[in-house]
C-alpha cells in the first residue's frame, strides 16, 4: 500500500486446474475464463486489490496459463515509475524438478518474491471468485488484532459446507477455533444453526508468521501442502488465526442488494447462475459501480449494432455484437452475431459466437468461436443435448471453444 500505510504484497493464487468448470477450462486456467461479457474472473480480485491501493501483486500460475499470462501482461500494466506491478509468476521449480504440490507449496516456491519486497503483511487471495471487497478493512482488523493470519469468511447454508473450507469461530466470534476443509456435516453457528462460515480463500498474513508456517509445512511429509488443508489448520491449532466477517465489508457505490455478494463459480451451474444474477432490472450483483470499478481490457471494437428485427431484453450485450434475431435474459461477449430468426434465451455466449438464421439456443454456455448453424437447436431436445454436449447437474449445456453444433 502507498501513502504512508503498511507495506503489503498481494499474492493471487491462480494455479488451479478448474476441472469442475469444463468445458470452459479445457484450454485455459479457470481465472482466465470470461465472465460478465468482457471480464476475466481474475479481474475481480485484481480490481479489489488495486482499488485498495495494494499495487504490488504477484499472480502465481501453473496449468494452461498462456491465456491468463497474456491477459495480465497486456491489461494490468501498472506504473513502474512508482515501483508498482502486477506480474504473472509461473511455476519455476526453484526447489527441484517438480510442479506445485498445492497452494501452500506454490507460495513456498515463490518466497524469493517476498524476500525481494520485504513487506510487513501479505494478502493471499484466490483468483476465481465474483465479488467486490475492500481488503483495507480486513487488513486493518488484522493489524489491530495482532493475529498471525486473518481469514475472510462468509455465511453459507450448512447444507453447502462440503464445497468449502469451514471456519468454526470461538465463543468471542472472532478467534478461529477450528478450520475444516470441505466437511460433510459440520456444526452450525451459535444462534444460526443452519449456517456456517465458509472460507472465501482470502487471507491476510503477518509476513513472519506465513514464512515460518510454510517452512514447517514443507518439513511435514504427511502434509497436502495446501493453504486451506494445511496452513490454516496448523495456525488455528497454534491460536494464531482470526475470522473476518465479510458481511462487515463495505465498498463505495454498493447497493443493499449486492453488499455481501460473493460467488464461487467453480462449476458450470454456479457460473451460469452468477450470470443470471447480473441481468435482472435490480441485479443481485451490479457491474455498473463506478465508485469501485472492475477493470479489464475493453479492446478496439465498434459499438453493438441492432438491425431490423434485432431485439434484446434483460441482457448484457457487449461491443462488436450484431443482433438481427431475438435475445432475452442472456449475456453476450464481444463479437457475437445473432442472425435473423435466431432465438437466444437464458444463455451465456462468449466472444465471436455465431448463431445462424433460425437457430435456437436456450439455457446454454457457449465458449468463444462456437458456430451454431442455421436451424440448429441447443436446449430444445434434452436427450440429444446429453449425447452431444456437456450437461451439468442443473441442466446447463456447455460447449467448448470452437465447437460446431451438429
Curated annotation (Swiss-Prot):
Positions bound to alpha-D-glucose 1-phosphate: 100, 165, 181-182, 199
Family annotation (InterPro entries): ADP-Glc_PPase (IPR011831), ADP_Glu_pyroP_CS (IPR005836), GlgC_bac (IPR023049), GlmU/GlgC-like_hexapep (IPR056818), NTP_transferase_dom (IPR005835), Nucleotide-diphossugar_trans (IPR029044), Trimer_LpxA-like_sf (IPR011004)
Source superkingdom: Bacteria
Family annotation (PROSITE patterns): ADP_GLC_PYROPHOSPH_1, ADP_GLC_PYROPHOSPH_2, ADP_GLC_PYROPHOSPH_3
Enzyme Commission identifier(s): 2.7.7.27
CDD domains: ADP_Glucose_PP, LbH_G1P_AT_C
Keyword Repeat in record: no
GO biological process: glycogen biosynthetic process
Pathway: Glycan biosynthesis; glycogen biosynthesis
Alphabetically ordered keywords of this record: ATP-binding, Carbohydrate metabolism, Glycogen biosynthesis, Glycogen metabolism, Nucleotide-binding, Nucleotidyltransferase, Transferase
A Pfam cross-reference name: Hexapep_GlmU
Reactions mediated catalytically: alpha-D-glucose 1-phosphate + ATP + H(+) = ADP-alpha-D-glucose + diphosphate
GO MF annotation terms: ATP binding; glucose-1-phosphate adenylyltransferase activity
Subunit architecture: Homotetramer.
PANTHER family: GLUCOSE-1-PHOSPHATE ADENYLYLTRANSFERASE, GLUCOSE-1-PHOSPHATE ADENYLYLTRANSFERASE-RELATED
Family to which this protein belongs: Belongs to the bacterial/plant glucose-1-phosphate adenylyltransferase family.
UniProt xrefs under HAMAP family: GlgC
Summary of the function given for this chain in its UniProt record: Involved in the biosynthesis of ADP-glucose, a building block required for the elongation reactions to produce glycogen. Catalyzes the reaction between ATP and alpha-D-glucose 1-phosphate (G1P) to produce pyrophosphate and ADP-Glc.
Name of the featured protein: Glucose-1-phosphate adenylyltransferase
Gene: glgC
